Amino acid sequence: MPAWSDDKRDDPQPCRDADQGKFETTVRDGRARIGRIHTQHGVLETPALLPVINPNIRTIEPREMWDRYGIQGLITNSYIIWKHDDLKQHAVTKGVHDLLNFPGVVMTDSGTFQSYMYGDVEVGVEEIVEFQRLIGVDIATMLDVFSRPDMTEEEAEKAVQTTIDRSQASLDSAQGVMLNGPIQGGIYRHLRKASAQSMGCFDF
């Protein structure tokens, strides 16, 4: 990551088409890995800290994060963008990078947390992935089912299975866009293991 600077940083160069979506391991230590994810908005070095940006509330402007603090990528919420007409129109016509004024890697969440906080979201499993693709995100996230710490084992198991059941349709809707496959299971270790094993069978 570049040192803090008051100077404007150059925008990143897109990766080669053949490298799009590629994860490259550069250092390995046991099961730990350091690597690079190749995207159309630069190469993201991992592990990476991605600040979360609410498109309606910007404590620090995304462009300042890029220029001054050397942030390579950030996360924003596609459901918030989808739900607000002004944000949605801007993102659809000019892209999410223009909406946020951020040239680096943009990853989006799908509305799962909003579902946890406020009840069911108003968008479909395939629809929200298609929307993320439409607005040009680099890394999208499927609409999974959140596993709360206070869930019973039966409830957590249902969240695991529902997330698995939504996976293939979500991948089909992504049409080549990198897609996260979240792991569920809550406080139950055997469910987290089963979730990871099942989700690992898909092309996330």
Model-derived features: where do they sit?
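Glycine-rich phosphate/ribose-binding loops and adjacent secondary-structure elements
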Residues: 2-8, 161, 170-204
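Non-catalytic, usually N-terminal nucleic-acid engagement modules in DNA/RNA processing proteins
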Residues: 2-175
